[in-house]
Amino acid sequence: YTTLFRSDYNLYNYLPEETEYFHASWRREALTELGKDYVIADGIKGSGHYIGTYIALSTLQRYWWGEGEVKFYIDGDEQYPTICGTGMEDYFGGSWSFAKHENGKTIEQTYTTPFLGYPYYSRHDDLVNNLYHNDDCPPMRGFYRWHVMDPVFFDEELKVTVQQIGVGHKGLFERQDDLSSVAYWYQKEPHNVFSKLPEKEKRWPR
Protein backbone atom coordinates (compact mmCIF):
# COMPACT_ATOMS: atom_id res chain seq x y z
CA TYR A 1 0.00 0.00 0.00
CA THR A 2 1.08 3.59 -0.63
CA THR A 3 -0.24 6.56 1.32
CA LEU A 4 0.42 10.22 0.54
CA PHE A 5 0.50 12.75 3.36
CA ARG A 6 0.79 16.52 3.24
CA SER A 7 1.44 18.63 6.33
CA ASP A 8 0.73 22.33 6.76
CA TYR A 9 2.66 24.36 9.31
CA ASN A 10 3.15 27.94 10.47
CA LEU A 11 6.38 29.70 11.41
CA TYR A 12 6.43 31.91 14.51
CA ASN A 13 9.11 34.05 16.09
CA TYR A 14 8.08 32.73 19.51
CA LEU A 15 5.53 30.43 21.11
CA PRO A 16 3.19 31.33 23.99
CA GLU A 17 4.22 30.20 27.46
CA GLU A 18 1.13 27.97 27.64
CA THR A 19 2.21 25.94 24.59
CA GLU A 20 2.00 22.16 25.07
CA TYR A 21 4.69 19.95 23.51
CA PHE A 22 4.42 16.44 22.13
CA HIS A 23 5.79 13.58 24.27
CA ALA A 24 5.98 9.80 23.91
CA SER A 25 7.15 7.02 26.23
CA TRP A 26 7.96 3.37 25.35
CA ARG A 27 7.78 0.58 27.93
CA ARG A 28 7.99 -3.20 28.01
CA GLU A 29 7.59 -6.08 30.42
CA ALA A 30 8.76 -9.29 28.75
CA LEU A 31 6.87 -11.18 31.47
CA THR A 32 4.23 -9.18 33.31
CA GLU A 33 3.95 -9.62 37.07
CA LEU A 34 1.06 -11.82 38.15
CA GLY A 35 -1.76 -9.79 39.72
CA LYS A 36 -0.09 -6.42 39.06
CA ASP A 37 -1.33 -3.90 36.50
CA TYR A 38 0.96 -3.17 33.56
CA VAL A 39 2.00 0.50 33.53
CA ILE A 40 1.51 2.23 30.18
CA ALA A 41 2.58 5.68 31.44
CA ASP A 42 3.69 7.05 34.80
CA GLY A 43 5.61 9.97 36.22
CA ILE A 44 3.83 12.49 33.99
CA LYS A 45 3.85 15.74 35.96
CA GLY A 46 2.36 19.01 34.80
CA SER A 47 -0.59 20.11 32.71
CA GLY A 48 -1.60 18.57 29.40
CA HIS A 49 -3.72 16.02 27.59
CA TYR A 50 -3.24 12.36 26.75
CA ILE A 51 -3.76 11.58 23.07
CA GLY A 52 -3.03 7.93 22.38
CA THR A 53 -1.88 4.41 23.17
CA TYR A 54 -0.20 1.67 21.16
CA ILE A 55 0.12 -1.80 22.68
CA ALA A 56 2.02 -4.81 21.34
CA LEU A 57 0.93 -8.04 23.02
CA SER A 58 2.58 -11.45 22.76
CA THR A 59 0.31 -13.85 24.61
CA LEU A 60 2.14 -16.50 26.65
CA GLN A 61 -0.95 -18.20 28.06
CA ARG A 62 -3.98 -19.79 26.46
CA TYR A 63 -7.50 -18.43 26.19
CA TRP A 64 -8.89 -14.93 25.86
CA TRP A 65 -6.61 -12.12 27.00
CA GLY A 66 -8.68 -8.91 26.86
CA GLU A 67 -10.61 -8.55 30.15
CA GLY A 68 -8.16 -6.21 31.91
CA GLU A 69 -9.40 -2.67 32.62
CA VAL A 70 -7.52 0.34 31.19
CA LYS A 71 -7.25 2.92 33.99
CA PHE A 72 -6.40 6.65 34.01
CA TYR A 73 -5.21 7.99 37.38
CA ILE A 74 -5.56 11.77 37.14
CA ASP A 75 -4.39 14.57 39.46
CA GLY A 76 -3.87 12.74 42.72
CA ASP A 77 -5.92 9.57 42.20
CA GLU A 78 -4.55 6.77 44.37
CA GLN A 79 -6.62 3.63 44.90
CA TYR A 80 -9.35 4.44 42.39
CA PRO A 81 -8.81 5.99 38.93
CA THR A 82 -10.93 8.79 37.50
CA ILE A 83 -11.44 6.76 34.33
CA CYS A 84 -11.76 2.96 34.47
CA GLY A 85 -12.65 0.94 31.40
CA THR A 86 -14.37 -2.41 31.03
CA GLY A 87 -11.62 -4.35 29.26
CA MET A 88 -8.66 -3.95 26.94
CA GLU A 89 -10.67 -5.24 24.00
CA ASP A 90 -13.30 -2.55 24.63
CA TYR A 91 -10.66 0.19 24.86
CA PHE A 92 -9.40 -0.77 21.40
CA GLY A 93 -12.88 -1.02 19.91
CA GLY A 94 -13.37 -4.77 20.17
CA SER A 95 -16.48 -5.18 22.31
CA TRP A 96 -17.43 -7.83 19.74
CA SER A 97 -14.25 -9.75 20.80
CA PHE A 98 -12.74 -9.18 17.34
CA ALA A 99 -14.64 -12.36 16.46
CA LYS A 100 -14.87 -13.81 12.96
CA HIS A 101 -16.19 -17.24 12.04
CA GLU A 102 -14.41 -19.44 9.51
CA ASN A 103 -15.00 -23.15 8.87
CA GLY A 104 -17.04 -23.48 12.05
CA LYS A 105 -14.38 -21.90 14.26
CA THR A 106 -14.10 -18.48 15.89
CA ILE A 107 -10.93 -16.57 15.02
CA GLU A 108 -9.73 -13.05 15.82
CA GLN A 109 -10.29 -10.49 13.08
CA THR A 110 -8.06 -7.45 12.61
CA TYR A 111 -9.53 -4.08 11.66
CA THR A 112 -8.59 -0.41 11.33
CA THR A 113 -10.41 2.91 11.72
CA PRO A 114 -9.08 6.49 11.92
CA PHE A 115 -8.98 6.54 15.74
CA LEU A 116 -8.69 2.95 16.97
CA GLY A 117 -7.92 -0.46 15.64
CA TYR A 118 -6.33 -3.90 15.77
CA PRO A 119 -4.20 -3.90 12.62
CA TYR A 120 -1.78 -6.74 13.34
CA TYR A 121 -2.05 -10.41 14.28
CA SER A 122 0.47 -13.15 13.51
CA ARG A 123 1.78 -16.47 14.78
CA HIS A 124 4.78 -16.25 12.47
CA ASP A 125 7.83 -13.99 12.62
CA ASP A 126 8.35 -12.96 9.02
CA LEU A 127 11.74 -11.48 9.93
CA VAL A 128 13.11 -14.97 10.60
CA ASN A 129 14.89 -16.75 7.76
CA ASN A 130 16.73 -19.76 9.13
CA LEU A 131 17.45 -23.13 7.53
CA TYR A 132 17.24 -24.98 10.85
CA HIS A 133 13.86 -23.96 12.25
CA ASN A 134 10.55 -22.46 11.16
CA ASP A 135 9.18 -19.02 11.96
CA ASP A 136 6.55 -20.02 14.56
CA CYS A 137 6.24 -17.70 17.57
CA PRO A 138 3.75 -16.85 20.33
CA PRO A 139 0.69 -15.03 18.93
CA MET A 140 1.57 -11.36 18.36
CA ARG A 141 -1.02 -8.57 18.33
CA GLY A 142 -0.88 -4.81 17.79
CA PHE A 143 -3.54 -2.28 18.89
CA TYR A 144 -3.91 1.50 18.75
CA ARG A 145 -6.28 4.11 20.22
CA TRP A 146 -5.93 7.81 19.34
CA HIS A 147 -7.76 10.14 21.75
CA VAL A 148 -8.25 12.85 19.12
CA MET A 149 -11.98 13.15 19.74
CA ASP A 150 -11.78 12.30 23.45
CA PRO A 151 -8.49 13.59 24.92
CA VAL A 152 -7.82 12.85 28.58
CA PHE A 153 -6.97 16.15 30.28
CA PHE A 154 -4.82 16.49 33.40
CA ASP A 155 -3.70 19.53 35.40
CA GLU A 156 -1.07 18.04 37.72
CA GLU A 157 -0.20 14.43 36.93
CA LEU A 158 -1.22 11.32 35.02
CA LYS A 159 -0.70 7.57 35.26
CA VAL A 160 -2.14 5.00 32.83
CA THR A 161 -2.31 1.24 33.50
CA VAL A 162 -4.00 -1.91 32.23
CA GLN A 163 -4.87 -5.06 34.15
CA GLN A 164 -3.64 -8.45 32.94
CA ILE A 165 -6.85 -10.47 33.07
CA GLY A 166 -8.16 -13.16 30.74
CA VAL A 167 -11.06 -15.57 30.69
CA GLY A 168 -11.21 -19.30 30.05
CA HIS A 169 -13.61 -22.17 30.57
CA LYS A 170 -13.23 -21.76 34.36
CA GLY A 171 -13.84 -18.00 34.35
CA LEU A 172 -11.64 -14.95 34.81
CA PHE A 173 -7.96 -15.38 35.69
CA GLU A 174 -4.81 -13.28 36.13
CA ARG A 175 -2.44 -13.55 33.16
CA GLN A 176 1.28 -13.17 32.50
CA ASP A 177 2.16 -12.08 28.97
CA ASP A 178 4.81 -10.12 27.06
CA LEU A 179 3.54 -6.56 26.81
CA SER A 180 5.04 -3.38 25.35
CA SER A 181 3.47 0.00 24.75
CA VAL A 182 3.90 3.58 23.61
CA ALA A 183 2.00 6.38 25.35
CA TYR A 184 1.46 9.71 23.57
CA TRP A 185 0.55 13.04 25.15
CA TYR A 186 1.00 16.81 25.02
CA GLN A 187 2.04 18.81 28.06
CA LYS A 188 3.48 22.14 29.10
CA GLU A 189 7.17 22.17 29.89
CA PRO A 190 9.12 21.36 31.95
CA HIS A 191 8.57 17.59 32.09
CA ASN A 192 10.01 14.83 34.25
CA VAL A 193 13.14 13.05 33.05
CA PHE A 194 12.20 9.64 31.67
CA SER A 195 14.27 6.48 31.53
CA LYS A 196 16.40 5.87 28.47
CA LEU A 197 15.45 3.12 26.05
CA PRO A 198 16.99 -0.23 27.01
CA GLU A 199 19.55 -1.97 24.82
CA LYS A 200 18.20 -3.23 21.50
CA GLU A 201 18.48 -6.86 22.65
CA LYS A 202 15.89 -6.13 25.34
CA ARG A 203 13.55 -4.60 22.75
CA TRP A 204 13.57 -7.53 20.33
CA PRO A 205 10.29 -9.42 19.95
CA ARG A 206 9.98 -12.72 21.76
Where are these regions (language model features)?
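Positively charged, low-complexity/disordered segments
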Residues: 1-3
